[in-house]
Every structure is written in C-alpha cells, then in structure tokens.
Amino acid sequence: MEHEVAVSGGDSSLEEITGSSKLKPSKNTAIKCLKCDKVYIFPSDKDDCLAHLYMEHRLVIADVEDIALLEDYLQYWEKEFHTHEFEQYCTTMFLDQLPDGKYAKNEKYYLLCDILPQDYELRRRLKEKRLSEALERHQFELTDRTFSKECLFCRAIIKGLRADYLDHLFDKHFLLVGKPEKLVYVDELLDHLEENLNRLMCLYCEKIFRDRPTLKEHMRKKGHKRINPNRREYDKYFLINYNRVPTAPTPRKQHLQKRRRETASVSTVADPETGSVDFDKHFARPDSDGEHDSDWSDWAADGEPSSIKCLFCHHLGDNFTALKKHMHEVHRLDFEKATSSLNFYQRVKVVNYLRRQMCLLRCVTCDLQFDEEELLVEHMAQESHHGIGDKESWDKPEFFFPYIENDGLLCVLDDSGGDDPDVDTVRIISEDSLAQINKDAERLSLENFKLL
C-alpha cells in the first residue's frame, strides 16, 4: 500500500462548495461520475453511483455513510479529478481479486479517505455546512406561519405553524411523529409519510395492505402510528443527528456488522408460505447483539421492581406493602382505602395524575401552583391535601400513560377492589386474543404518550 502527496490547490473550489447555504432541503440532484460522463440522480441513485465507482473505476470512498452532504462532496472531487489522476489524491492498494470477486494478481484499487488533509478539511466543512443549514431551516420552520397542508388522515387543512399540524396529527389521530422543537425538514418528512400512506404502507413496519381501513386498523392495534426509529432514512429529520461525531467501531461491533452483512441477503426474503417479509428481523437495532427478545435472564425473580417511589416525596419503598405503610404513616394516605372503589384502569389514572401534579409542583387536591417543592410539601401537609384528587381531575384518557419512565408503582397495582366488568368497559377482539379493556384506553396506544 502506498500513498502519494496530494497536489496543492483546490482551496477556492472547496470554499465554493462549502460556502453557500440553502434554506430549503435539496431535492433530486444530478451528480456526474468522478471519472466518466455517467450521471446519477441523488439521493435515489446513490448506491448505484458508489457501485459504479468501485466496479468501473476501482475507487472506494472511506466512511461514505458518515459524509455530510455527499452530493457536495462528490461534486468537489469531480472537479479535482477532472484535471488530476486518482494517484495524486488517493491511497493506492493492490489486491488479488477483481471487483466482481474473481481471482487476479495485483489488481490496483484507490481509496479516497480523510488521511488526506484536503479530504479531511472538506468533510469537516461539509459537516459544519450541513449543521448550519439544518439550524437555519429549523428556526424557519418553528416561526413560519405560511404553512398550509391537508391532514394525512382527514380532509382538514391546517394553516399556520407546523407545530399546529403535528399537534393535530397527535390530538386527533394519535400519530406521533415527533416534537416540533426536535424535528427539521418537516415538510419533506410529511411528504414522505403521505407517500407511504397513499401506497397503503404501514409507517412503522412498512407492510402493504389491501385498503386504507385495513391499514388504519393494523396501525392502531399494533401500535404502529409512529415512524420506525431504526430506519436510517429518518435520521435527517431529527436535529440531534446533525452534531453527532461518528466513533470508531470496536472489535465487537465490527464482528456484529459482519454478521449483519452475512444475514442481510436473506433477512428480506419473503416467507414462501405467507409471502410476507420479516421486517422485525431486517430492521433490528444496529446495537443489538443478535440475541432473541425472549431472553428474560435479567428479569427480577419475584416480578416486582427493586424499589418503588412514593407518590408525594422522594422516598423509595422496598416493596408495595412498605410503600403503602410509608404513605399512611408519613402522608396520612391509606392508598388501599382511597382506591378501594376503583378498578385497575382508574388506579393507573390516579397514579399518573399524582405523578404529574407533583412534577409540575401543583397540589393534588386544590391544584394550587408553587414555585418550590418545599412550599408544595408544606402546603399539602398543613392542609391535609395528601389525597388522590377529584375524579374529574384524573379520569382522563391522557392519564393512561406513565408520566415518569419505568414507574415501579404501575407494575404492582392489582385488579382487586372495585372492578366491575359492566362499568365503563367494552369487550373487543384483538389480533392475538380476546381482551377486556376500558373504552378510553381502547382508543389510545402507548406511543401516544409524549415523553418529557
């Protein structure tokens, strides 16, 4: 392997490539091959272009997935290679095989990578440019009031802020796309989702259905009213991804990547009997070590959380019994007595309501707002307001969903007490089994909860 010193110059073209900034996201871009006259349309032809560079010109671009604004990167090097040969910029490698894998002796290949200072600087500037463009676009989308678009599910036309449109999707149709302050290129994202829905494709698992009602029922029952976070094409729509620094893969990750490459060719093969694709396997998380989800070795033996947080203070009970004793002795609340007439779903609502009130520094009984936690605790103690609140305050669908992550108290609530199968419930048939659930809960699914 050898590496030749790069030709000086090219700074002006580098400034030209990385200096401009665009407010709108780029659409289809025509990119010319770095060595011949063949033209590719990005981003749809990206893989074809890279394959062409390898098969026809034996050029490999290192860490191509980590290059920001790949179109600009290729345009820059197309100008450079128009007047210079690969050897002047690339690392030269000699391998004993042809591009198609057949054996051959001392075949020459070229590696374009950031070991070259000019390439390193180009990648750095493109990353800064991409971040700048994303932030500029993000600020525009948060404040622009000229937005207007028809809802993905109903005929309503939402005008004004894009945040209003996203709120409509969540409030009316329980579709959780993301928080406006964390999204960028929202218009493009919505167009992509609309295209998938028009193709009768599930937004999460991307299975195709015969008609729209069947698709909507599938997405509702399976909890698929959200985008799949494991699909890399959605990364560009989340602002957090624009400032991440790629890290060198560890030997373990390299081994896992090799395993995934070996199985990639078969992971998308359709089942001969059903004709369907195993999307769960194909789109498994990259950091998964290949083990099945049925590995429950780390599950607690007794099925109960190791500690449970008090509803009114920071005390952690060793178990549910100890926590109830603490609340009765310290806060004068007999939890069993206060919830004896409530069914399971109502108890879930009560717990989540109390969690929210305490997090917002609001009294659970009179809803009085405080600026400091100490003042709230003092008020509730003096006024004997350690209760569960009025039913009209907590009997709302929003309180079906946990307000704090991994709330151990929700795991130990039992079904004893005031459960009445004829009150406020409806019997439905799910895709897997017969289940009895509350009417309000039946309309919602867990992804509708807005994480704090």
Swiss-Prot record:
It is found in: Nucleus; Cytoplasm. It holds the Pfam family zf-C2H2_2. Residues 248-271 are annotated as: Disordered. Residues 252-261 have a biased composition (Basic residues). GO terms for biological process: positive regulation of gene expression. One of its GO terms (molecular function) is DNA binding. One of its GO terms (cellular component) is chromatin. Transmembrane segments: none annotated. Keywords: Cytoplasm, DNA-binding, Metal-binding, Nucleus, Repeat, Transcription, Zinc, Zinc-finger. A zinc finger (C2H2-type) spans 200-224, 361-385. Belongs to the ZNF277 family. Interacts with components of the origin recognition complex (ORC) complex, Orc2 and Orc3, components of the SAGA transcription coactivator-HAT complex, Gcn5 and e(y)2, components of the mRNP biogenesis THO complex, thoc5 and e(y)2, and a component of the TFIID complex, TBP. Also interacts with polybromo, a component of the chromatin remodeling SWI/SNF complex. PANTHER family: ZINC FINGER PROTEIN 277. DNA binding protein which is involved in the positive regulation of both basal and inducible transcription. Mainly localizes to active promoter sites and interacts with components of various transcription and replication regulatory complexes, such as the ORC, SAGA, THO, TFIID and SWI/SNF complexes. It may therefore regulate transcription by promoting the association of these complexes to their binding sites. This is Zinc finger protein 277. It comes from Drosophila melanogaster (Fruit fly).
